[in-house]
């Protein structure tokens, strides 16, 4: 799939993170996917749904369980939501954006009520500490960050899955090679 490799071989993943020269990362889907879906007769709206399933919405606006409304109810203001959203674009998981470095230590202590000790703990999970369950975090994560696979994508016919097989399993839920 595609020519992003050094020879004729399966690509290693459908969705990749490209490191930017100025810092940060950019999430990109294999550019052959939309072309292949078009060639197989999928409508543009279906293709967009499949791509969004793979790479995510890259926002928590409209996400299930963890979204701007629920975060406002936990103490987030517009400035904090803006800082959070700017980090979600390159996030592999939403939990990586919920930290004192993104939100600001003062905000985390004064607005959210966390202690210095909590924020200093390397394994501190801010989303769990805010009261979200693992299932809620997973659902919001899939919405925002995507699945990184076409397996289970809306509209995609099972007989078309082999077209998108890679050298590795793709994403957390991928089973195919």
Predicted feature locations:
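Long, C-terminal-biased catalytic regions of enzyme "large/alpha" subunits
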Residues: 1-177
